[in-house]
């Protein structure tokens, strides 16, 4: 059972994993439940690891606790991956990563973009992108961008208060990501964002995202 008042991650799967890990080695009693790792044995005898995380939002650059906590979580996830895997392994890191990787992932309007940067609001601050870049440069591919390198009008999060999903053009951010190790690049077939589910009654402010791998 998940406590809906706190951060949490979950994984739904068709194949039973061989091993499930909850939490990072660096977690303590105060750490929210943000990390799940499932390891699968595939029919071709290869091993696939899927890590699902809910990365902290971070509030803003000046926040005394939330912003450092976001940085620490990114560092801890990177260190875990770096210690446990190599880029040639079959590894997926996915979830609400709370960072828009490139400017084409920002769809809140130019004035709002400038204001967020000026106010130090999180989601695409330069230092945040450095945290994410460290992971991708290790050997992870943004699967959506691999298939849609130039798209600038598809987003995964839309603010309820400003009714960003209902506006035309839609106003949102692409902050939910599926990263795959370079060892999975050749098996990645397509990727997208599901607006149909976001259009349902009482939806989440986030859209489902997906990537198809043929392994």
Q: What spans do the regions from the language model cover?
A:
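Active-site regions of metal-assisted phosphoester/phosphodiester hydrolases
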Residues: 13-215
């Amino acid at each position: 059972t998940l406590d809906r008042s706190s951060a949490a991650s979950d994984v739904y799967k068709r194949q039973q994993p061989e091993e499930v890990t909850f939490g990072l080695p660096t977690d303590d009693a105060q750490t929210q439940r943000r990390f799940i790792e499932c390891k699968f044995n595939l029919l071709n005898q290869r091993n696939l690891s899927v890590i699902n995380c809910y990365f902290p939002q971070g509030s803003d650059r000046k926040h005394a606790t939330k912003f450092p906590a976001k940085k620490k979580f990114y560092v801890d996830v990177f260190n875990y991956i770096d210690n446990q895997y190599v880029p040639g392994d079959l590894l997926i890191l996915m979830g609400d990563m709370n960072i828009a990787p490139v400017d084409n992932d920002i769809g809140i309007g130019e004035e709002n973009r400038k204001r967020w940067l000026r106010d130090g609001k999180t989601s695409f601050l330069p230092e945040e992108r450095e945290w994410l870049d460290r992971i991708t440069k290790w050997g992870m591919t943004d699967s959506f961008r691999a298939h849609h390198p130039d798209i600038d009008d598809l987003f995964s999060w839309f603010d309820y208060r400003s009714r960003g999903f209902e506006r035309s053009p839609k106003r949102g951010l692409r902050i939910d990501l599926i990263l795959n190790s370079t060892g999975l690049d050749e098996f990645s077939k397509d990727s997208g964002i599901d607006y149909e589910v976001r259009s349902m009654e009482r939806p989440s402010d986030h859209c489902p995202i997906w990537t198809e791998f043929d392994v």
